[in-house]
């Protein structure tokens, strides 16, 4: 009430000549929104665009021409030197006291070097590395005694490897039991059935014992070059690369890929992290199982 009385007592002086400021004419007073499709522009990427390397693009598209270019340059240089000696009237026999002869000999040496370089470039070509289709059959074998949580954990590991890497086959052996065999597997030539993992034979092999002894990840970047290939008969015949990841002291994960040197350093680190997680989960499960079996006995 007191506040109202105070406001009523305040008198604002009124002047008839007072001028009120008007907004500038160019100031937009109204903003209209239109929902018509013609006024909407398609959204495009407006950030920095990657620069194109024109030289690299030209070389990749004209590989044969670039490799044979030193031959053309060397041949043209050789013909130019011979034509110069013929036209200039210099004796065809090289004279050590003549500066022209010494320059021609140097030019001939460079021309021959270009010719040899071109021949080497044409004869030596890098082998293109492309993914292959594994020769085998799809397989999904999971240990029946595992609880649903463990099966979900193993399937998560498989999906993670399949999506993020070139993994096409996965075998996990822990505590002497093959917990899961999933992905592409070899096919038996006799009965056309899948080749199941034989844990006893695998654990007796030098590959398994070497990994468990070193307790470190083993990366076979080109599987065909390693004699231990015969110890992994359950993998497809054309498996290109294999990673052997130890799972603590009691297990191993065999990961097969379809590309030579297809597993990058980040893939190997990711596989190591998955291996540590699986080792912790499987270790707790088997410890609990042993305690339960002891109590029941």
Curated annotation (Swiss-Prot):
Gene Ontology CC: chloroplast; chloroplast thylakoid membrane
Localization in the cell: Plastid, Chloroplast thylakoid membrane
Biological processes annotated in GO: cytochrome b6f complex assembly
Stromal topological intervals: 34-70, 125-297
InterPro entries: CCB2/CCB4, CCB4
Lumenal side: 92-103
Membrane topology field: Multi-pass membrane protein
Range annotated as the organelle transit peptide: 1-33
Domain of life: Eukaryota
Residues passing through the membrane, by range: 71-91, 104-124
Keywords: Chloroplast, Membrane, Plastid, Thylakoid, Transit peptide, Transmembrane, Transmembrane helix
Knockout or disruption consequences: Seedling lethal when grown on soil. On agar plates supplied with sucrose, seedlings grow very slowly with a chlorotic phenotype. Deficiency in the accumulation of the subunits of the cytochrome b6f complex and lack of covalent heme binding to cytochrome b6.
PANTHER family reported in the protein's UniProt record: PROTEIN COFACTOR ASSEMBLY OF COMPLEX C SUBUNIT B CCB4, CHLOROPLASTIC, PTHR34943
UniProt function note: Required for the biogenesis and accumulation of native cytochrome b6 in the thylakoid membrane. Controls the conversion of apocytochrome b6 to holocytochrome b6. Required for covalent binding of the c-type heme to cytochrome b6.
Name used for this protein in its record: Protein COFACTOR ASSEMBLY OF COMPLEX C SUBUNIT B CCB4, chloroplastic
Organism: Arabidopsis thaliana
